[in-house]
C-alpha cells in the first residue's frame, strides 16, 4: 500500500502539546508512526559507554508521533491538507485534495 506521508514531506501536527508545529518527516516507522524534525522533543537519560567514547547524561531527541496526528502541509494554501492518489502517464502519483496539485 502506498504511504500518504513519506520521508522528507513537510507536515503539520494536528493534536497534542505540539499542535500547529511544522517540520520535515525524518523517518517513517513501520508501526504507523513518524518522527518529525523539531517536534515532540523528549529528554532521555543515557548511560556513558566508555568503550565507545560515549558520554552519559541528558540527551534531547525527537520521539515518534502517530501518523494520524499529522497532516501534510500544502505550501500554496498554507494549511494542512489531505492526500489522494491518481494515475498519470501510467504512474501512481500523490496530489493535494484541496487544489489537485501533484506533490
From Swiss-Prot:
Function according to Swiss-Prot or TrEMBL: One of two assembly initiator proteins, it binds directly to the 5'-end of the 23S rRNA, where it nucleates assembly of the 50S subunit. One of the proteins that surrounds the polypeptide exit tunnel on the outside of the subunit.
Protein name stated in the entry: Large ribosomal subunit protein uL24
Keyword match Glycoprotein: no
Pfam families: KOW, ribosomal_L24
Gene Ontology biological process terms, A to Z: translation
UniProt organism field: Mannheimia succiniciproducens (strain KCTC 0769BP / MBEL55E)
Domain of life: Bacteria
Keyword annotations from UniProtKB, A to Z: Ribonucleoprotein, Ribosomal protein, RNA-binding, rRNA-binding
